Amino acid sequence: VFIDVSCSVSKECWAPCKAAVGTDRGKCMGKKCRCYX
């Protein structure tokens, strides 16, 4: 799932992903965070 968090590196997504989907597995794709669920 993409969340509305801009990023330049994947580690910037880990905390927002943890908050959004309950897991810190995420990647930065196209300047946006993608969380896996």
UniProtKB/Swiss-Prot annotation:
Locations listed in the record: Secreted
Pfam entry (one): Toxin_2
SUPFAM superfamilies the record matches: Scorpion toxin-like
UniProtKB keywords: Calcium-activated potassium channel impairing toxin, Disulfide bond, Ion channel impairing toxin, Neurotoxin, Potassium channel impairing toxin, Secreted, Toxin
GO CC, one annotated term: extracellular region
Positions bearing the site annotation: Basic residue of the functional dyad: 27
Coiled-coil region list: none
Entry-linked Gene3D superfamilies: Knottin, scorpion toxin-like
Site residues by UniProt (Aromatic residue of the functional dyad): 36
Assigned protein family: Belongs to the short scorpion toxin superfamily. Potassium channel inhibitor family. Alpha-KTx 01 subfamily.
Record's protein name: Potassium channel toxin alpha-KTx 1.4
Native source organism of the sequence: Centruroides limbatus (Bark scorpion)
